[in-house]
Amino acid sequence: SYGHGAATRAKQLLVQAAQPPPAARKHPAAAMIPTGPVTAPKGRHTVEAEAQALPQQAKMQATVAAGPLSTGGVLLRLIKTMIDTKMTKEFNEIIFIISRCQLTRNCRMNSVDAIKLILPSIRGKLFGFLKARIPMXXXHGVMLDDDEYTAMPVGFPKLEIEDETRKFVFRIPKFSKRALVDPSVTPGERTPKLGNKCWNMAAA
């Protein structure tokens, strides 16, 4: 199961994110969708998301590089993030909510096949666990649209190491309205608790 606490938080955040951004707000991602099978031009775009982190809620802004997937979807590679919060060293859970209205013009149905998000290296206590290769269990499902729990595609989430920089990579399946990713990282656990679908980051 997804877990009652996480599901409750997810529902609360999904209600908050149910409405599209105000029309008056000019967002760079609004121009991402050209005609044809490719759903995003190459280049840099800004994607905003709600983020809930322990112990407080925060706003996240990510700058991404966009390019087409072979499936006709869009591949987003994170270049930088800005999280407006002071919990940089203590958090162990962060939830991202992505509204289709922020990624597609007029929220067109089926215009995004999958989204791949790359989180930056996490500093502080969690980063120390990564350097020491201490096992950490993380939930790897996604809540899509109306509380539909879906596992990520095979091979995701995963840990990428590039130029000694560790990045978390998530791929979100196709959705109609919005998607929620809740990694729920638990340092020091080799195996998940019974009933939870988890992924061991240190074994990646």
UniProtKB/Swiss-Prot annotation:
Component of the acid-soluble organic matrix of the aragonitic skeleton (at protein level). One of its GO terms (cellular component) is extracellular region. It is found in: Secreted. The keyword Secreted applies. Its main location: secreted. It comes from the Eukaryota. Keywords: Secreted. This is Uncharacterized skeletal organic matrix protein 4. It comes from Acropora millepora (Staghorn coral).
